[in-house]
Amino acid sequence: MPQNLAVVIERPDLYTITCNGQTVKAKRNDWWLDKAFGRIGIASVARAGENVVTIKAAPFTMFHELEPAYVLGDFTLKPAEKGFVITPGHALTLGAASQATSPSGCAGWNLQGHPFYSAGVSYRERFDVAKPAGRFIVALPNWYGSVAKVAVNGKPAGFIDAPPWECDVTQYVKRGQNEVEITVIGTLKNTLGPHHGKPALGAAWPASFHQGPNPGPPPGDSYSAVAYGLFEPFVLKQAVK
């Protein structure tokens, strides 16, 4: 059971919340994404198998707008007949072109147990530099995300957000071994949706969220998620005049 397992409820102060019949509450100033999204730890009351989170409002008023609940923690998701099953976490790797594809043409985090993940995933490589002369460029040959952060030897070196998908890191490179870290950032599309009705990538209107499966959650494999990630090793290029 992940020790950081939590459920996020919008405006938790308006409800009585239980997990498996045990009362749980959001701690003050413990929120996620938005200050109205209270993070509620449930590791102490969760169990293997089915878990039920219940929210009650009495009386129910115009301020009680029901919104999705989000489950957070160190775990992965396995597609099931209805939605997903939480399974032990594992490290993400380079996407494989042989798997199901998305805009990048390769498999991303969504097919590695993280279909709703939107934050950053870091990839590291070490490069030996015999002679630090000329310019050094970090290049991403195949990736998909909103932006990629670049760090060299533990120091922030810049961002990659537009073609030709390169970042000049000359001033951070030293003679000998250099560690380069690329952090690919996704977007909130996979987290917030829309997840149903095969929405077009790049479009999200109020009506997009009005479409839902009937009855109940569809198979996990049918959820709409973008394949973010790194699909080929990044490279450190040296340009000498």
Language-model segments: what does each one mean?
Residues 38-40, 117-129, 165-166:
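Short beta-strands within extracellular/lumenal beta-sheet-rich domains
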Residues 17-39, 150-166:
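Solvent-exposed beta-strand/loop surfaces of large extracellular or lumenal domains
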Residues 36-52, 58, 167-177, 188, ...:
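Short, surface-exposed tryptophan/glycine-enriched loops
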Residues 122-128, 233-237, 241:
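Mature extracytoplasmic enzyme cores
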Residues 1-19, 53, 127-153, 180-184:
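Aromatic-lined ligand-binding clefts that engage carbohydrates, nucleic acids, or primary amines
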Residues 1-2, 10, 33-35, 46-48, ...:
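Surface-exposed coil/turn segments at beta-strand junctions on protein surfaces, enriched
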Residues 87-126:
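Edge strands and adjacent loops of beta-rich recognition modules
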Residues 58-85, 186-238:
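Glycine/proline-rich low-complexity spacer/linker segments in large multi-domain proteins
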